[in-house]
């Protein structure tokens, strides 16, 4: 197994101690998809902070919206450099990693380092308008998630438990309700 890609669906945590221990024992990286669970937690720690990297979507129907776009988080400096280049046409100058930039210059001494395109990529840089939208919503994320949790409880209380599953483990969740 090269990696485990785990999706936290509809605001529910997909992690367990058993899974995290297994991945640690086997040295298998975890990649978290937190697109539908912004602000949700596992053991009082935010989802998206457990793995090698995580992704968040800011599509209009998710917990936070910049109308379109998303974000990838990682503590790995090499992955960070690659992602920064990938979002910006593959330009080496976007790496924001001095060691990586130096290696690129050493490997390409005859080329202007400002115009080295290392691989085919895209222009998926966010706009300042999107950033303003996202930051304004980030301030209200916890409050909005509390409302979602209250709505979820009310919804479950009004379902017929003999016909529908109503015993969800909602600790740390940030449901869509």
Task: Please report, for each region that a protein language model flagged, where it lies by residue.
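Active-site phosphate-binding strand-loop segment of PLP-dependent enzymes
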Residues: 1-66, 71-73, 77-81
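PLP-dependent aminotransferase class I/II
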Residues: 3-7, 12, 16-18, 25, ...
């Amino acid at each position: 197994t090269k990696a485990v890609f785990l999706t936290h669906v509809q605001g529910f945590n997909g992690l367990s101690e058993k899974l995290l221990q297994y991945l640690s024992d086997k040295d298998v990286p975890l990649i978290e998809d937190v697109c539908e669970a912004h602000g949700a937690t596992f053991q009082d720690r935010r989802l998206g902070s457990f793995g090698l990297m995580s992704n968040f979507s800011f599509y209009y129907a998710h917990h936070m919206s910049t109308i379109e776009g998303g974000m990838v988080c990682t503590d790995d400096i090499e992955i960070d450099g690659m992602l920064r280049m990938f979002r910006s046409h593959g330009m080496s100058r976007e790496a924001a990693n001095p060691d990586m930039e130096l290696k690129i210059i050493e490997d390409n001494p005859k080329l202007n380092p400002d115009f080295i395109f290392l691989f085919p990529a895209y222009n998926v840089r966010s706009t300042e308008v999107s950033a303003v939208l996202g930051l304004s919503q980030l301030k209200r994320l916890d409050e909005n998630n509390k409302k979602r949790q209250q709505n979820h409880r009310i919804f479950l209380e009004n379902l017929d438990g003999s016909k529908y599953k109503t015993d969800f483990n909602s600790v740390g969740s940030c449901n869509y309700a």
